[in-house]
From Swiss-Prot:
It comes from Gallus gallus. GO terms for molecular function: protein tag activity; structural constituent of ribosome; ubiquitin protein ligase binding; zinc ion binding. There is a cross-link at K6, K11, K27, K29, K33, K48, K63 (Glycyl lysine isopeptide (Lys-Gly) (interchain with G-Cter in ubiquitin)). The gene is RPS27A. This is Ubiquitin-ribosomal protein eS31 fusion protein. The lineage of its organism: Eukaryota, Metazoa, Chordata, Craniata, Vertebrata. The record marks H68 as: Essential for function.
């Protein structure tokens, strides 16, 4: 029977084969006509790559069927070298977890009266519960950047 082999260049060659012929035999016939070594040939039929040990009848290749010839690609992707950094990686700042942190902001005296130790930010943007940091010369809100400066250090 006669089959067609279409190469990458678009050229179509005809081969005389039998249904019992193996794929290896077909590749050898292509080598005789085109000069491409069988180890570099890949034959595709109906979207499947044909394996060397099987026959044409295994793949249901009938007379006047067209096989597509593509060349086997050499190698794979280039191996990349792992980067080595000269300086060590900077550690991220870890926030310290303080148990019962609310106790820093309030004081309970012997009468049971609660007084604030830190000033609460009056800005509408911050809302209730945002306290200002007390520095030696000012009170500062870290959320809205509001700052109150003292005239004298003993004026706290």
């Amino acid at each position: 029977m006669q089959i067609f082999v279409k190469t990458l260049t678009g050229k179509t060659i005809t081969l005389e084969v039998e249904p019992s012929d193996t794929i290896e035999n077909v590749k050898a016939k292509i080598q005789d006509k085109e000069g491409i070594p069988p180890d570099q040939q890949r034959l595709i039929f109906a979207g499947k790559q044909l394996e060397d040990g099987r026959t044409l009848s295994d793949y249901n290749i009938q007379k006047e069927s067209t096989l597509h010839l593509v060349l086997r690609l050499r190698g794979g992707a280039k191996k990349r070298k792992k980067k080595s950094y000269t300086t060590p990686k900077k550690n991220k700042h870890k926030r310290k977890k303080v148990k019962l942190a609310v106790l820093k902001y309030y004081k309970v005296d012997e009468n049971g009266k609660i007084s604030r130790l830190r000033r609460e930010c009056p800005s509408e943007e911050c809302g209730a519960g945002v306290f200002m940091a007390s520095h030696f010369d000012r009170h500062y809100c870290g959320k809205c950047c509001l700052t109150y400066c003292f005239n004298k250090p003993e004026d706290k």
